[in-house]
Amino acid sequence: MEDFVRQCFNPMIVELAEKAMKEYGEDPKIETNKFAAICTHLEVCFMYSDFHFIDERGESIIVESGDPNALLKHRFEIIEGRDRTMAWTVVNSICNTTRVEKPKFLPDLYDYKENRFIEIGVTRREVHIYYLEKANKIKSEKTHIHIFSFTGEEMATKADYTLDEESRARIKTRLFTIRQEMASRGLWDSFVSPREAKRQLKKDLKSQEPCAGSPTKVSHRTSPALKTLEPMWMDSSRTAALRASFLKCPKK
């Protein structure tokens, strides 16, 4: 699974996921299913945000050009992917500026058009079950919830899906592709079933020995985005930086 994640996702997303797991004392090499889930969630958050801007009249528009008009403002502020301290700093700043109620839990995005925080969910289970779990945890009508599944289903607060159909279809297609690629490598069942995942983990740990096999070649170059994470979310260059992550996973 770890090899799959490093092949399938944009290196920047992989680095952010590793950083997030280490912040909570988790090891991406051991908790590989969680590693894959975090990368998937990060990518969906970025795809949700990408190409969406607000023009000078306050209208939401979609711009896929790499160099949008300077008067355009990103519609979504990405909170997911930052370290906790910076994430709360961004949330506090938004609340102070917009007078929106501060959430109890860190949300994933802020929508400047609808003036609301958004919680994004990606589930391997039934969307309505995961939606209820999220709503139960958040306990706030102010935070908008949008759940996607790997089967193309989705569910959102008051059936308000925020994005246009084409943007949502792009996300669903990517999730379906990830599922298909996992299945083709025999990884999907363990990704869905915790019991199967534990069995696979024991098997993997048993087979791991020092110097066993050749290590996978991975680029360890630090992404410029990680050095300047804060301004990156505000700059239009993020579209180009993340576009590669929308591509189909390479076959082995």
Curated annotation (Swiss-Prot):
Belongs to the influenza viruses PA-X family. Keywords: Decay of host mRNAs by virus, Eukaryotic host gene expression shutoff by virus, Host cytoplasm, Host gene expression shutoff by virus, Host mRNA suppression by virus, Host nucleus, Host-virus interaction. GO terms for biological process: viral RNA genome replication; viral translational frameshifting. The record marks 195, 198-199 as: Important for efficient shutoff activity and nuclear localization. Pfam families: Flu_PA. The record marks 202-203, 206 as: Important for efficient shutoff activity. One of its GO terms (molecular function) is RNA binding. It comes from the Viruses. This is Protein PA-X. The probable endonuclease active site in the N-terminus and the basic amino acid cluster in the C-terminus are important for the shutoff activity. The C-terminus acts as a nuclear localization signal. The C-terminus is recruited to host protein complexes involved in nuclear Pol II RNA processing. Residues 202-223 are annotated as: Disordered. It is found in: Host cytoplasm; Host nucleus. Plays a major role in the shutoff of the host protein expression by cleaving mRNAs probably via an endonuclease activity. This host shutoff allows the virus to escape from the host antiviral response. Hijacks host RNA splicing machinery to selectively target host RNAs containing introns for destruction. This may explain the preferential degradation of RNAs that have undergone co- or post-transcriptional processing. The active site is at 80, 108.
